[in-house]
Design a protein with these regions (language model features):
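Mature-chain termini and adjacent capping regions
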Residues: 1-174
């Protein structure tokens, strides 16, 4: 009788663990699709407004907060109304489907057509407002500036910049 009770106890416990594992797997976010060598061109009124390139994209549109993940590098090229381009690269990015935000992380570099460059570890890009911002440490380099700081806020062309907690040098015309 003892072996029979032990057998049923073993079966019951092992089944309940399997059910728990299964439930945890259902809760885990698993991409519903993936794609390799992404090249996505966005247009506005027949003109190219942006180009996104990445070696890999994971689609998590089944998540509670849907998003696309770019785990192995991303390059985004933004064009202004004069067809000048701003290039953004990073090691990793998440593009949130229910908002206009792209969260870029790791070796983030933004370069404009004037060769103004922002370097940081994390940056948000708001596609709707065409706005860049971070609260992380940054370095901003242009022909007459080399600024270090923590916190940066700007339009995509670096025409309206707000630096926070800065140090560095700026050339002034007298």
């Amino acid at each position: 009788m003892k072996p029979l009770i032990l057998f049923f106890l073993f079966i019951f416990l092992s089944c309940s663990q399997d059910k728990e594992i299964f439930n945890n797997l259902k809760k885990a976010e698993i991409p519903i699709s993936s794609a390799l060598q992404i090249n996505s061109v966005h247009t506005d009124s027949g003109k190219v407004s942006s180009v996104l390139n990445s070696p890999k994209m994971l689609n998590f549109s089944n998540a509670i907060f849907p998003y696309y993940e770019f785990p192995n590098h991303i390059e985004v090229i933004l064009y202004d109304k004069n067809n000048n381009k701003t290039k953004i690269t990073s090691d990793y990015a998440i593009s949130y489907s229910n908002s206009d935000l792209i969260d870029l992380r790791g070796n983030v570099i933004v370069s404009t057509h004037l060769r103004d460059t922002l370097i940081t570890d994390q940056l948000y890009y708001d596609r709707g407002q065409e706005w860049l911002f971070t609260n992380f440490d940054f370095r901003y380099v242009s022909s007459d500036k080399d600024i270090f700081g923590k916190g940066f806020d700007s339009d995509k062309s670096f025409e309206k910049i707000k630096f926070l907690e800065v140090n560095g040098y700026v050339s002034l015309d007298e």
